Amino acid sequence: MEIAMNTRGLLDQLLKSGQDLLQNKGVARQDGGKTSSSGKGGLDLGSLLSGAGGGALAAGALGLLMGSKKARKIGGKVVTYGGLAALGVLAYKAYGNWQQKQASAPRGEPQTVDRLPPAQAEQHSHAILRAIVAAAKADGHIDDRERQLIDGEIAKLTGDVELQGWLDRELAKPLDPAEVARAATSEEMAAEMYLASLLMIDETNFMERAYLDELARQLSLDAGLKVELEAQAQKALEAVPA
């Protein structure tokens, strides 16, 4: 079913919130209403969520999706992606490099999210946001308590009740890479969804890496395109100051 929501604005805020996320050193997990303070993941949830700026609010939502340790460990990826257009540019570069290596005739200019009119960009954004939420669940850290916290932060970012309800349902449903992949209606969209999932994944975590590999399979990503997407993500990440 096609859903008329404005996911593009929310997604752009989330993708641009990486600097705030890093400045606040991520988000602590909640356990029985108490903020955890482990060595690597002991971070101040309250100070981040009470940030007045939209960037801080978006960082709070993104940090909760990631989980405290992961937010601190891979928060640089968020800075790498910048915003929605930046993600599209990375997908465009990867797709272009892959096309150049194909023996077959060129398929034309890649239609990534940064090059699309609003209606099509919204469709891509919807699929990308679905991929981000699913990837966030891959390590199993989102319980009912954290889901409520995420819902609260999303409500601060958008007044779109339909979008809020859709996100809550996405968070609540069982993780199913095949179902996520069905949102992709083009190779470019599949590439963007995989890149967005890379953003949320700690590739050293077995569960998350297994999810990512299965998502690539369900998206029917060509092995060469998958390599190019991962190379673009890594190259951009290496350019982020430590």
Task: Please place each PLM-identified region on the residue numbering.
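Small-residue-enriched hydrophobic alpha-helices in membranes
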Residues: 2-130, 147-242
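Hydrophobic residues within the alpha-helices of tandem HEAT/HEAT-like
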Residues: 132-136
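Acidic, glycine-anchored loop motifs typical of Ca2+
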Residues: 140
